[in-house]
UniProtKB/Swiss-Prot annotation:
Organism: Beutenbergia cavernae (strain ATCC BAA-8 / DSM 12333 / CCUG 43141 / JCM 11478 / NBRC 16432 / NCIMB 13614 / HKI 0122)
Recorded name of the encoding gene: fmt
Superkingdom field: Bacteria
EC class: transferase
Matching Pfam families: Formyl_trans_C, Formyl_trans_N
Protein name: Methionyl-tRNA formyltransferase
Binding site for (6S)-5,6,7,8-tetrahydrofolate: 109-112
Gene Ontology molecular function: methionyl-tRNA formyltransferase activity
Length: 311
């Protein structure tokens, strides 16, 4: 089949590579336009754009998919199907009607759970033991379309959202290829999503990533792992922002929420229940460092407390 691939970040690359190596023909890659993606200060192509160019796939980088020339370009491609992996923009209905077999999305949850932009982060934050990925046909509703296939993946106890997303991104291409092969062969039987079990996963804001030290240790641990690497867990110390890496709940005497205690080369922080051990952090304007090294040079007051000025 003639396939349009739509995606933008690194997690979309395994599927793009798999499609290019498959029986199907990737005629173009639709991706978000160049943007500032690092501290270099200039716009850079998306990871998908760079990979598509490497693979010899023509790249489409419209500022808006609602522009009339985008629909014209897609019609000219004579598309059988479009595959979406984290494109990063909502598709208007006139575009959805262009490919003969519609647009098939690889979504990183087992639908109807965690519909929305941040399914992996929400799965980690809510302590899900199992999640997965789903291929479904995109419709006008938010991740509501009929399902072609599902895979499942265990959420490991120390997974960050980045860890889990990387595994799903590597497992997803097989599901996508199986789905496309079934569509091409006429054996695909998409099933409507059930009405029960629907949960929503909106994008996490920077404010939601502010560590809530007054919550129980388990909740704090899940919050930080869910926000790692994005949007990035953080707190404050003496009015300055500090990035916080994954934590480890420990068996230690309780501390006031946010209180910092240095003990035997460990940096402990109080929560609403038991303390947690801080492994890494990044003080304002500095790179990541291990917490023990930071504590040795930080000249902490005896009552130093993360988040004391949160209000």
């Amino acid at each position: 089949m003639r396939v349009l691939f739509a995606g933008t970040p690194d997690v979309a690359i395994p599927t793009l590579r798999a499609l290019v190596g498959s029986r199907h023909h990737v005629v173009a890659a639709l991706t978000r336009p160049p943007a500032r993606r690092s501290r270099r200060g200039h716009d850079e192509p998306s990871p998908v754009a760079a990979t598509a160019a490497e693979l010899g796939v023509p790249v489409l980088e419209p500022r808006s998919v609602r522009a009339t020339d985008v629909a014209e370009e897609l019609r000219a491609l004579d598309l059988d199907v479009a595959v979406v992996v984290a494109y990063g923009a909502l598709l208007p209905e006139d575009l959805l009607a262009i490919p003969r077999h519609g647009w098939i999305n690889l979504h990183f949850s087992v639908l109807p759970a965690w519909r929305g932009a941040a399914p992996v982060q929400h799965a980690v934050w809510h302590g899900d033991e199992v999640t997965g990925a789903t291929t479904f046909r995109i419709t006008a509703g938010l991740d509501e379309g009929p399902v072609y296939g599902v895979l499942t993946e265990r959420v490991r106890p120390r997974d960050t959202s980045g860890d889990l997303l990387a595994r799903l991104a590597d497992a997803g291409p097989r599901l996508v290829l199986d789905t496309l092969d079934a569509v091409a062969d006429g054996t695909a039987r998409p099933q409507a999503q059930p009405d029960d079990g629907v949960t929503l996963a909106p994008r996490l804001s920077v404010e939601q990533a502010r560590v809530r030290w007054a919550d129980p240790a388990l909740a704090v641990d899940r919050q930080v792992r869910a926000c790692t690497p994005a949007p990035g867990a953080w707190t404050t110390l003496d009015g300055a922002r500090v990035k916080v890496g994954p934590l480890d709940p420990v068996d230690a005497p309780p501390l006031p929420a946010g209180r910092i205690a240095v003990e035997r080369q460990r940096v402990l922080v109080g929560t609403g229940s038991a303390p947690v051990e801080l492994g890494r952090l990044a003080p304002a304007g500095k790179g990541w460092m291990d917490a023990a090294s930071w504590a040795r040079g930080a000249r902490l007051a005896g009552d130093a407390t993360f988040g004391a000025d949160d209000g």
